[in-house]
Design a protein with these regions (language model features):
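Alpha/propeptide regions of enzymes that mature by internal proteolysis
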Residues: 2-246
Length: 247
């Protein structure tokens, strides 16, 4: 297995001669103005943990989408990233999260505006595997319960760093500050590919805003004959050009 780190988009890669590959990213804003050497070290540690979680599944013969979900799980649970716990806050001070999971055969599931799902990528997977739909906006508590995914109060997702960033944005700072949308793409031993993305959006975004991450072809895309893509950046720009599909 080989690993590498690339900045400013913090990226980790694992691959082998068998063809299995896992690439993860912590987003374009993961090393922002609030970064310290200690925080950067924690980010790199969490990235390695995420890489290991997904890659071990690939080595055991698991399909690509399971490796993607496992890697994203670790990052959603780590408060340094803008996904799950540690998500950026909306203008009304809540965590409102999006996620998407897509496989190379064109099957896809996504959620937007979830505020109590502990791991939004699990909800995206549930939409893909348990419903006939592609995208759910602000699913009900009953729907979430039916999917069998874990939940938390919204307070669980909110960190002091995100509160500070929101206060700065609302006092005239950079309201479009990026905080590191996360993602993963994988290729399994059978040659199948998958992509997943999870995000809390942009600090101080309006309630109900939807970025590129949960939109197939915009922030997340997988096509067996071409490529698997997970994007990070300003979602509005990606949506306008259907960026992931253009790669």
């Amino acid at each position: 297995m080989t690993t590498s780190s690339v900045s400013p988009v913090t990226t980790e890669l694992a691959g082998s001669e068998t063809g299995i590959t896992l690439i993860i990213h912590a987003g374009a804003g993961s090393r922002g103005k609030h970064s310290t050497p200690e925080r950067i070290a924690q980010v790199e540690l969490d990235l390695q943990r995420a890489l290991d979680a997904g890659y071990q599944l690939l080595e055991s013969g698991a399909p690509a989408h399971e490796a993607v979900v496992a890697a994203i799980h670790v990052m959603e649970d780590a408060p340094e990233f803008n996904a799950g716990r540690g998500a950026a806050l909306t203008s009304d001070g809540i965590a409102q999260m999006d996620a998407c999971l897509m496989t190379g055969d064109g099957e896809v599931g996504a959620v937007t505006g979830v505020s109590t799902v502990k791991n939004p990528i699990d909800a995206a997977r549930a939409v893909k595997e348990q419903t006939k739909h592609v995208l759910f906006a602000d699913p009900t508590d009953a729907e979430i319960a039916d999917w069998g995914v874990a939940t938390e109060s919204n307070e669980y997702f909110i960190t002091e760093q995100r509160r500070q960033s929101l206060a700065e944005a609302q006092s005239g700072g950079d309201e479009w500050e990026k905080h590191g949308t996360i993602g993963a793409v994988a290729r399994d031993a059978e040659g199948n590919i998958a992509a997943g993305t999870s995000t809390g959006g942009i600090t101080n975004q309006m309630h109900g805003r939807v970025g590129d991450s949960p939109l197939p072809g915009c922030g997340t895309f997988a096509n067996q004959s071409t490529v698997a893509v997970s994007c990070t950046g300003i979602g509005e720009a990606f949506i306008k050009v259907v960026a992931a599909h253009q790669v």
